[in-house]
């Protein structure tokens, strides 16, 4: 059994899936509908504004976009689905966040926020352990409630090996 993980845009992943370069495609984005693919997993994934424990904004019942605009942010790169959603929320109010750091690794961003380096906007599955441990606080930002979809696809004509079926079952949990 060989497991190779690749990162790519949704379009690139679906093209690779369609040309049989990959067996499965896992996305975190807006809902995707592809008639030539089987949708094996389709789950909601909340995206959260998080701050280090003890941050002044964490004490507030609600945080406005104007308050966020004045904060130091560590974000994923432009073009990432949830980063784009944050930028759109801000732009709708005539605001923008200019992050002092952009990284491709959401896990590393989470760790940096835990160490007090700024705020971030990350999927709940990335931050859930830190929230439970009390090292991060989730900010309540009513003007920017974002939910993406975790989706796993395979080609409709693809024969699924036992290992692929086991992986799909693992992701479904």
Feature-to-residue mapping (PLM):
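A local structural motif
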Residues: 1-5, 91-100
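Hydrophobic residues within well-ordered alpha-helices
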Residues: 16-18, 68, 111-117, 152
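Secondary-structure junction motif
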Residues: 28, 57, 72-93, 160-164, ...
């Amino acid at each position: 059994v060989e497991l190779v993980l690749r990162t790519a845009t949704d379009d690139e992943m679906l093209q690779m899936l369609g040309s049989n370069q990959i067996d499965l495609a896992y996305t975190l984005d807006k809902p995707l509908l592809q008639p030539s693919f089987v949708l094996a997993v389709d789950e909601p994934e909340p995206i959260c504004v998080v701050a280090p424990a003890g941050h002044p904004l964490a004490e507030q019942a609600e945080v406005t976009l104007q308050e966020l605009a004045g904060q130091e942010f560590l974000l994923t790169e432009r073009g990432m689905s949830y980063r784009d959603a944050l930028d759109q929320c801000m732009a709708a109010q005539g605001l923008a966040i200019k992050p002092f750091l952009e990284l491709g690794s959401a896990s590393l961003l989470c760790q940096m926020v835990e160490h007090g380096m700024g705020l971030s906007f990350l999927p709940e599955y990335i931050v859930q352990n830190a929230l439970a441990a009390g090292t991060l606080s989730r900010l309540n930002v009513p003007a920017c409630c974002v939910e993406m979809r975790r989706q796993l696809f395979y080609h409709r004509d693809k024969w699924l090996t036992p290992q692929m079926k086991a992986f799909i079952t693992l992701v479904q949990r």
